């Protein structure tokens, strides 16, 4: 199997070192509006598109902005989509059921389901905070969605599942499942306190300063491996809409 399926390349960091983000790890992307989160998701999808076409990766997309971001992507790449909270609940139930099926089928046989056995299930979530926060009836739905997503994050990696979630809000109230993401990327944020929420104290102490990223540098990003605490600073290449439509 092509090793490229397991890496997302974002060019080079400020020291000229390659920026290689593991594609098989739950990832949280945090950044203000206009900070360039689309460059991160676009780069991820561009890298994975050949493997989606080969049936080695299966993309599900939740975009609670009515599909305005995901709608730019070649629809042939999307297995299932959800543009509303109610649709997201249905998708998450089906996704969680598939995780259970894989656990039952492969328990005692393998420790990790790999793409040559079953397609990697890539769940991309745009505006993830809107999935976990709600008012009135939506609050009940958001609570259910959070529980389902928690189940997927906890059990999913061994079953060949990767969740990539994007949010503007790093606060725990908005992203209660933040600890479930061992890999973090932060674009422009408002303050050091937001950076510590998004990336953790170790990353900031090791030099990550996303609150200093200029507003006119979209795609500029700090990447943190939460296990090692290592940080890299880079600017993700811009992926235009025409490229997304023709992937």
Question: Which role fits each region the language model picked out?
Answer:
Residues 1-108, 121-125, 129-199, 203-208, ...:
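P-loop NTPase catalytic phosphate-binding loop
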Residues 20, 113-114, 213:
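Short secondary-structure boundary/capping segments
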Residues 204-219:
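Conserved C-terminal "switch" segment of AAA+ ATPases
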Residues 179-185, 215-247:
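Conserved P-loop NTPase motor module
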